[in-house]
Amino acid sequence: MISRRGFGQFCAAALVFGRRLLDAANRAPLSWAIQPGASPGSVRQYRANAQIILLGIPVFHRSDVGDGSASWRESATEDGELVRRLEFTGRSAPERAAGLNRFGFIQELSRSGEAIYFGLMTSSPEESAAEARKALHSTAKDAWYSAIDGRMSADGIETARAHFLAPAKTAPADRQILIERARQELAEAPITKSAAASVPQPFLHALASFLCDPRKKQAQYAYNGRMYWLTVERAREAKSPGVVRVSGSLRRVEGGKPIEFRLWIEESSPHPLPLRIEYQAKSYLRLTFEARA
């Protein structure tokens, strides 16, 4: 027979559970107006280095050709629901990158059963070193940009895309103007919808779950209306105690050539922002982001 105290605890738990169900049914969709609390979170700044590769052999290297940053903020609501925001930004510095002006960033926001993301990048059609050489020392005042806005929830996956021409100014002081222009273009873009068996994570959130849990090896994530496999392998760095190397690959669920990357993290960090990131951006270009001291 249940005790009076036990019955009271059961009723309290049922009340909280019912309240959460009601809140989930009635709450407004997740938006960028909803942000983690006052906690500053974690931020890391990077220096970008570039390496040109021909026939699999590195033939040219240049340091400090750009910069980047990563941030991780999260907090719990009164009901214990976790709100998390992740962001990564990278850009080339034209004065250090032979006039090449490239910029890209992705930001994601999530809570229980729902996630949104917003991305913006300079369009880079070059597929070979010869084509990339023609893009150097450009005097063009405008550049083409691609923007994307995505939402994942129990209702499925929604994606909007935009391609637009705007001033080729990507320095931090000019960035907000460019972001506002991208949001304007996306607001007028058509939305494509697709179904999903469950609510998928966006890319940075899927990666963050791996970095926090060494037991995880593979998961799916959604981007641009498609599903991808993210697979990782971890190994401790013998020469750097407390540092773990994470080797990963991205591949569309329906198949295709994988995209590979490597990053290094502090093993005990609650918000393991990478110390170093290596990424094969093009067949001829390898980028490395190293954390600034």
Q: Where on the chain are the PLM-derived regions?
A:
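Surface-exposed beta-loop interaction hotspot
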Residues: 160-194
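A generic signature of intrinsically disordered, low-complexity regions enriched in glycine/proline
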Residues: 13-17, 153, 178, 217
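N-terminal export signals
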Residues: 6-24
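Acidic, serine/threonine-rich low-complexity disordered tracts
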Residues: 21-156, 193-293
